[in-house]
């Protein structure tokens, strides 16, 4: 497998990533603490309307200097990390990890960790000391980021929090 930056005309290949997964628990923030709660559901691919909504936003992100890092198995995109270019945080030392997705058949093989590490290296080269992450509140996702060193952000970005209040807002050192 190879890891490399995506070209603008490859952005829509992101939608070929298989997001399917069975979930048994989600996290919620209560009084500044993570609380694990039972919540069984099956995610089958991309949510309705997500592709139509996010595609233009991804092009805007790319055009303003966002970094799109892909993991490829031969010519097949099996994972992606998208790093935005807009500084966040009171000190302006955070960059948002907009996306981190790995196809179902490639999980638990270090793909996500490699993509996160590459996004962190790019963020560091741009002067950031933290990745800002709005993590899907599923148990597997939150645990992945915690294993990579991320912690709950107790002062989330107001705009990003308003967009995704159910997500677990985290920061991860780069």
Locate predicted features.
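Acetyl-CoA-dependent GNAT
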Residues: 8, 16-93, 98, 103-104, ...
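Conserved acetyl-CoA-binding loop-helix of GNAT-fold acetyltransferases
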Residues: 99-102, 108-121, 146-147
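Conserved GNAT acetyl-CoA-binding A-motif
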Residues: 123-136
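Structural motif
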Residues: 126, 147-148
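C-terminal "cap" of GNAT-fold acetyltransferases
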Residues: 134-138, 148, 155-174
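Helix-turn-helix
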Residues: 141
């Amino acid at each position: 497998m190879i890891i490399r930056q995506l070209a603008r005309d490859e952005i829509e290949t992101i939608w070929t990533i298989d997001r399917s997964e069975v979930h048994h628990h989600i996290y919620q923030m209560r009084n500044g603490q993570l609380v694990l709660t039972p919540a069984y559901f099956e995610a089958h691919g991309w949510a309705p309307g997500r592709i139509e909504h996010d595609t233009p936003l991804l092009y805007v992100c790319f055009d303003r200097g966002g970094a799109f890092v892909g993991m490829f198995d031969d010519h097949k995109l099996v994972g992606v990390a998208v790093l935005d270019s807009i500084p966040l945080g009171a000190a302006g030392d955070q960059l948002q990890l907009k996306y981190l997705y790995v196809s179902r058949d490639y999980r638990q093989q270090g793909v996500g960790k490699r993509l996160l590490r590459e996004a962190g290296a790019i963020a560091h080269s741009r002067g950031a000391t933290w990745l800002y992450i709005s993590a899907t509140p599923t148990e597997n996702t939150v645990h992945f980021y915690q294993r990579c060193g991320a912690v709950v952000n107790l002062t989330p970005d107001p705009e990003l929090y308003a967009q995704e209040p159910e997500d677990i807002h985290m920061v991860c050192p780069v």
